[in-house]
């Protein structure tokens, strides 16, 4: 049996690096409203931690044709939980950080048996930094992809180096080493920062030790590859994620068979190159993850327009997400060959809502399918 937890504030918790951490309102609301979603990848009879059991059951009811029968529990339920079969019990959060560990231990000290050590959490945090992917993954993927790939990222520890790198790039993307989707990222069309941007970047350097500076590419298409790292360090490729974002914030995913997604992706990327990159990711990260990280993760990529307008280049590592992703959720909702393609979207009005639409009723911008 597993206890599943949707803790979307994970990326911000990594930046804070504290046991006692209060997430921003949006992160807390997302967790409250969508805490039920592990039901879609959990196994029959697993537990899912939520803030409100009745609300989770009601939200789940609207999507009852998808997912498994699970048991929704609250932190109050965990306080009285008796561990009868510790050999088979596991805790599976969206992402591991010091905060979620402390929350579980405050609920029930017996969870200590299933918690990663503080050293392991520190290692996971370091590998979750954008600096890790920029230095240990992206260069090797570029080397393997040769002239068919683009992508570079520089970790800058002073504003002098930030300005030098921006001047070299012309147009840049500045990213906090740790931040959540859409946050901690600035797109800059100029070769030098204005006063506001310089103040923001200097603050990131002060708080996190440095900042990532990357060229701003002419992106044509977003996609990702989803993986799972096993206990022995071996890594399995789980599938392709075709998704849409706006301003760096997640909008939704295409739900389709792997064959259909490959056909869509083939319009913008060399599938043989994508397959080769996938193999290299498994081989490169296996050595880093073995004995440290077990669980789901994903690598976001993008197709970039060539400067001469003739085709596309592959950026093989825009982000390494060392946690479960919305792409993994989309894979859990993959339709059969006989079922129609669908769109999974996350939207916010008075609350966060997850919806699944047939493509004929696509409420997302159609750029999720074609640019």
Predicted regions located by residue number:
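ATP-grasp fold ATP-binding core
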Residues: 137, 166-187, 206-219, 299, ...
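N-terminal-proximal low-complexity accessory segments that begin disordered
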Residues: 1-46
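Conserved N-proximal alpha/beta basic substrate-recognition cap immediately N-terminal to
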Residues: 28-40, 49-164
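A long amphipathic alpha-helix within ATP-dependent nucleotide-binding catalytic cores
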Residues: 208, 237, 250-312, 352-370
């Amino acid at each position: 049996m597993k206890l599943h937890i949707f803790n979307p504030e994970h990326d911000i918790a990594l930046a804070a690096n504290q046991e006692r951490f209060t997430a921003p309102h949006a992160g807390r609301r997302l967790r409250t409203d969508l805490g039920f979603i592990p039901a879609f990848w959990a196994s029959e009879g697993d537990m899912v931690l939520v803030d409100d059991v009745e609300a989770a059951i009601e939200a789940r009811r609207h999507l009852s044709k998808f997912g498994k029968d699970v048991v929704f529990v609250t932190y109050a339920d965990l306080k009285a939980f008796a561990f009868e079969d510790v050999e088979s019990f596991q805790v599976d959060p969206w992402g591991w950080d010091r905060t979620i560990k402390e929350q579980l231990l405050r609920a029930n000290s017996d969870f200590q048996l299933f918690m990663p050590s503080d050293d392991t959490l520190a290692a996971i945090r370091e590998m979750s930094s954008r600096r890790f992917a920029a230095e240990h993954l992206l260069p090797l993927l570029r080397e393997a992809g040769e002239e068919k790939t683009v992508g570079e990222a520089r970790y800058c520890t002073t504003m002098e180096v930030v300005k030098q790198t921006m001047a070299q790039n012309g147009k840049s993307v500045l990213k906090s080493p740790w931040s959540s989707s859409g946050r901690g990222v600035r797109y800059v069309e100029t070769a030098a920062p204005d006063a506001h941007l310089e103040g923001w970047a200097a603050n990131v350097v002060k708080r996190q030790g440095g900042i990532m500076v990357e060229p701003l590419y002419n992106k044509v298409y977003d996609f990702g590859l989803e993986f799972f790292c096993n206990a022995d360090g071996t890594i399995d490729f789980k599938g392709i994620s075709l998704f849409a974002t706006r301003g760096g914030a997640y909008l939704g995913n295409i739900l389709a068979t792997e064959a259909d997604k490959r056909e869509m992706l083939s319009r913008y990327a060399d599938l043989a190159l994508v397959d080769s990159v996938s193999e290299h990711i498994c081989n490169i990260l296996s050595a880093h993850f073995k004995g440290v990280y077990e669980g789901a993760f994903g690598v976001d990529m993008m197709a970039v327009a060539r400067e001469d307008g003739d085709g596309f280049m592959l950026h093989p590592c825009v982000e390494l997400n060392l946690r479960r992703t919305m792409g993994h959720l989309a894979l859990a909702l993959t339709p059969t060959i006989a079922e129609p393609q669908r769109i999974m979207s996350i939207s916010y009005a008075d609350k966060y809502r997850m919806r699944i639409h047939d493509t004929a009723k696509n409420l997302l911008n159609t750029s999720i399918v074609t640019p």
